[in-house]
Amino acid sequence: MQTPQILCPVDHVKMTFTFPKHELNSVIDFIINNVPLPATDKPYSVGTVTPDGRLDMCKQQLGVQGIELVASALKINQIIKHLLLGTNAFGNPGAAAVAGLLSENNTIETVYLGCNYIEQAGCTAICEALEENQSVKSVWFKRNPIGAESMPAIIKLLSKNKRIRTLDLVNTCAGEGFHTLLEYLENNDTIERLYLSGNYLTAPTMKFVSNMLSRNTRLKSLYLSANNIGDEGVAELLPGLMNNTSLEEISLASCGIADAGMELLFTSLKAKKNIKSLDLGYAASTKVLGAKANQLSHASANHLVEYIIEQTNLCNLNLGRISLAETHINILRDEIEKRNGGRLEMNGYQSKHTYTAHQDSKAIKSVYR
């Protein structure tokens, strides 16, 4: 049995920054004075401001004291829309500072907190601050050890705040705590994009995902990559996928799905026309999380081809690192690329088209990663 681990280089809280304090002054002045956004990316000694309103402070070694200074300045700012704070080691104390900011600022739309050693107390503080917030649309907790104990605070947040549409819980190791969240999401009508990748989820949890999909009519994108789903998990997941009519994107990359699961997936969903993007490829975190790549035999590849031909709305297909026969490669390439903007990624092949990312994903693009 695998021991869940957080895939993050930050394993403790850093109280202060490693650079001279005056290096923060220029970006703090920009924030406090509500300076208009630059025409091109504007790098400072610490951090970068972008034309679309991102304050990118990822990997700037802010620590608790640094994030407190930035958060305090942002309370009165009306220019910054997207706050990127990944990998700054500020933990629960820094999360409390961000919470204080979010309880006052109603301009920020994106809060990216990935990889900061935030635990339950910090997650709860963020959630409580967002309950009455009027502007935030997406919250990214990825790679923080918030655990199962944080699920009640997240559920309470979603029950009160109807503006949040993207929730990222990638590699937060909440285990069976996700079951409670999934039960709540059965009747949620606001979350459109849910990230649960890299959480060591197994077949029993897929039953909860399936139940959620059967009842939820709002969710458009579901990310389950790098989980231990396997063929058994696909069987548990399928009833929900078959009943659901709102889902447009699903990611099952590196979920250890083999022949039986693939055949079941393609044959059962052949009549479904709502899926536009399907990722069965290879997740970057596969090896470090102990996940398993997906496999396609010649027989299941035949079912895949039949499925894709039927799915005329599907315009993004990722089969990265999956071995396919030349005949299957040619058919899939011709089929996907004749679709307007169709994108296909296979072992040794990537189409020239780029699948258009959702605006919430664009908003967390960092110049530092």
Task: Locate the predicted segments by residue.
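Leucine-rich tandem repeat or coiled-coil scaffolds
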Residues: M1-R369
